[in-house]
Amino acid sequence: VQGRADKVAAQALLARVYLYLASSKASGAPGYDWVADADDMYALAAQYASDVLEGQTVYRLDPDLGNVYDVDHQADGVEHIFMTSMNREASGMEGTYSQLPQMFAIQTGNIVYISSSLAGGGEVMKFMNYESGFQVMRVDNEFRDTYDDADLRKQLMVTTIYNEDGSVLATYDPSNLTSSDNVKNKFFYPFCRKYTDPKSNSNRTSANLYLIRFAEVALTYAEAAGPTEEGYKWVNEVRKRAGLGALPEGLSVADFREAVIQERIKELAFEGHGIYELRRLNRADERHITNKAFKPTYAYFYPAPQREMDLNPQR
């Protein structure tokens, strides 16, 4: 049932938890001294991920990447193990419906049209049936450039917007920032199309948060198992769907895991994983804003409140 967790979702979440424990211990991330052995945690992560990958027949990788983010295909699709249940026709407070597309859409003052195909061109569709975007969630230009041009996931970052008749309205360019054109000067960075709803009810949409996808579990297994035959199999399945070739054979455990981590970054971008990935890999200090005060330990855990420590002196 959409919006509710089943046994497979529980197994998938356990796989994620054990992977985070393992990698946090292995990387020396603050706060994980209590974890006894990283290898034991990796083994448990692989075990629970394998239960999801091999022990059920409901979920699998959707061979069509576009379907994964098609708002009207998700509820009966095969990729999403656990996600929210938003409804564009719901009334009341936000939470029964979502405004996620607005967070990503550029603010042109008109309805934004994008290609209905990840390949670009052809028929166009509304990003959402509403005129205003918030431009809050922005794609970093340098991040987009880390994707191979053959990677279909690169097309999930919009670089061209259209008029309703299908003609090109504007193309992204960093130099657009200084343009006198009121559309172009909003389109100086690409924007993510993982959250669209062409049939939205004004700003009320059915766009969901993707809490656990089958692809994540495949990559969890690969990272936990390391460069085994099955580890290679699952990371390469995700890469194949994205239009890419297999990882090189013969990688060391460290190099293989790093390759899988880079795959996770590209596969799960804009789905709420970023800060947690930085924390578990002990890399939060690599991504802070350099002209702002930064306390490394606070990027991982806030200090325990003094009142709670006073009430629990043995903890």
Label each region the model flagged:
Residues 2-5, 36, 202-209:
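Short, solvent-exposed segments of well-ordered alpha helices
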Residues 4-174:
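An aromatic- and glycine-enriched ligand-binding surface/loop that stacks and positions planar moieties
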Residues 17-21, 48-59, 220-227, 234-241, ...:
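Structured segments of extracytoplasmic/periplasmic soluble domains
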Residues 38, 42-45, 231, 235, ...:
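Amphipathic alpha-helical segments in well-structured domains
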Residues 63-65, 86, 158, 221, ...:
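Active-site proximal loops enriched in glycine and acidic residues that flank catalytic Cys/His/Asp
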Residues 70-119, 201-211, 225, 230, ...:
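Long, intrinsically disordered, low-complexity segments
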Residues 140-240:
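C-terminal substrate/ligand-recognition segments
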